[in-house]
Amino acid sequence: MNLRIHPSILNAKHDDMQAEFDRIAAGVDSIHLDIMDGRFVKPVTFDIPTIARYVKMCPLEFDAHLMIVEPEKHVDEYIQAGASLVNFHLEVTSNPEALIDHLHERGVKAGLTINPNTPVEELIGLAHRIELALFMSVYPGYGGQQFIPEVLDKVRAFKRHCAGRGLDPLVQIDGGINLETAPRAVAAGVNTLVAGTFIFRSEDYAEAIASLREVCEGVEPDY
């Protein structure tokens, strides 16, 4: 299993992002942007000019996690800013199929996100349409929350569905990821870790990233 790590830069030092990107770029696979509008969740983060500026600073792909209402009205702005993958919450759109189709028409990958209390069946029904499924293991809005282990049962159900049908979207988890929770998530079927607080509050980013890979190496799936 090729483990992917997408650092969430919400807790990075934004007064010197070029240095932050330089410190993490060699050890990770993509950059995770937690985009919040102050409506779906309370904080407001990462306006379009900021995203466009960050994309120019870093050669990696940017994974835009839209924690916003009415994502269908705004996705084109994030694509234009440089996002390579856009994932949106099932909880805030009445026609996810149309939005997935629009993302594909624009040439970007489509991801779907569910909160910890959203039935996984809603995501399973669209597994064949997406490149990434994101399971929130905390409630969205703020970094540093405690991991919700019950989410892993939803990951297992999703992975069993995909395995039985030859589907292989990325399975991403976001929230409370550290050296204890990362291998548990990987065992459940996760292959893409979003880690923010664990990386950016460490003294050595490269060491933190390497340690995540190390604890997940050789973990056997239990789904």
Language-model regions: role of each:
Residues 5-8, 31-33, 62-66, 86-88, ...:
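Hydrophobic faces of well-ordered beta-strands that scaffold small-molecule active sites
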Residues 17, 24, 34, 78, ...:
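Conserved, mostly hydrophobic/aromatic
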Residues 21, 72-80, 118-129, 177-192:
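Catalytic cores of alpha/beta
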Residues 26-27, 57, 81, 106, ...:
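Structural motif
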Residues 33, 37-102:
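N-terminal active-site wall of soluble small-molecule enzyme domains
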Residues 37-45, 49, 116, 126-160, ...:
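Glycine/Thr-rich beta-alpha phosphate-binding loop at enzyme active sites
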Residues 88-94, 134-145, 188-208:
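Glycine-rich phosphate-binding active-site loops on the catalytic face of alpha/beta enzymes
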Residues 103, 186, 201-223:
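C-terminal helical cap(s) of enzyme catalytic domains, especially alpha/beta-barrels
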